[in-house]
């Protein structure tokens, strides 16, 4: 395909973006689909960075993308800068390392479907949802090491995680740090040093302006004041 929806090549780094709804098919090429994803990924090798901001979508489509990333030859660094909800959280579990912005969120819940028909059809839909849930738990279990029961309960409650909770529960490995932080710290250190040197210079100058006789005279005055009291 000529239009590269996912890939952005800069500084010889393989940077991929999953931004939008995850769907099996897309009419306007504005959704994240396995077909489009695979066409961009299949000829690439080495380490890649995947930025994720998605409310989720089709769980089967997400499963296919998850598997592609899991099978990728190279490290897969997942960076969540906005939202990784529902099916998008499953994709995130394929990361060799998962990092979240301090303001980003992750959400996991039970799979949903729409069914029409009699009681037998409804039962089929319910059975299908149970199996889909078990497959999703597989991805969460591999990443977090939590028990299947724990994960199931979290999904039942539609659980939202900020980056701290996600790290605590094992869904995330660390925090996206501000690249400007080190620069700020360095500047602050030099600023403090400059201020300290400036103060020391000023103090030294003030000390030098007073002779020993002047200092002795001041001490005598202080002593006399105390004796008068």
Short names for language-model regions:
Residues 1-79, 83-87, 95-229:
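N-terminal organellar transit peptides
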